[in-house]
C-alpha cells in the first residue's frame, strides 16, 4: 500500500474513533418537475487534518479504504444517523421529504 493510502487510512481510523471528526455529510437537493425540493441525496465527505491544513480527500480515494478496512460499517451507521436527523428536521417544512443514501456492498 502506498504512503498516501496508509496516511489516509490512519486518518480514517483516527476519525472513526474520535466521533467521526473530519467526516461531513453534504446534501444534494432533489427537485420535482416544478423545481421544488422534494428530497436530498446524502454525500459523505472526508477532510484529513495535517500540519499543512485540512485536505478534502476524494470519495474515490477514501471509500475503497473504508470498505477494505471494514470501517465502512461504523461510518455508514454515522451517515445513516446524520441523514435521518436531517430528514426529520426537513419534514417540519416539507412533509414528504426523503433522503437517498448510497450504501456499500460490505
Language model features by range: what are they?
Residues 3-65:
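Active-site core of bacterial EAL-family cyclic-dinucleotide phosphodiesterase domains
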Residues 37-38, 71-106:
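Catalytic core of bacterial c-di-GMP phosphodiesterases, primarily the EAL and HD-GYP domains
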Residues 65-71:
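A short, internal acetyl-CoA/4′-phosphopantetheine-binding micro-motif in the GNAT/acyltransferase core
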Residues 1-4, 72:
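Residue-level marker of regulatory loop/turn positions in helix-turn-helix DNA-binding domains and
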Amino acid at each position: 500500500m502506498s504512503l498516501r493510502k496508509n496516511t489516509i487510512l490512519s486518518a480514517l481510523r483516527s476519525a472513526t474513533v474520535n466521533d467521526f471528526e473530519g467526516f461531513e455529510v453534504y446534501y444534494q437537493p432533489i427537485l420535482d418537475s416544478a423545481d421544488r425540493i422534494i428530497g436530498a441525496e446524502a454525500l459523505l465527505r472526508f477532510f484529513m487534518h495535517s500540519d499543512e491544513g485540512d485536505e478534502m480527500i476524494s470519495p474515490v480515494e477514501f471509500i475503497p479504504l473504508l470498505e477494505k478496512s471494514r470501517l465502512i460499517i461504523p461510518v455508514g451507521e454515522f451517515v445513516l444517523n446524520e441523514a435521518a436527523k436531517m430528514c426529520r428536521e426537513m419534514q417540519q417544512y416539507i412533509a414528504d421529504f426523503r433522503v437517498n443514501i448510497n450504501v456499500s456492498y460490505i
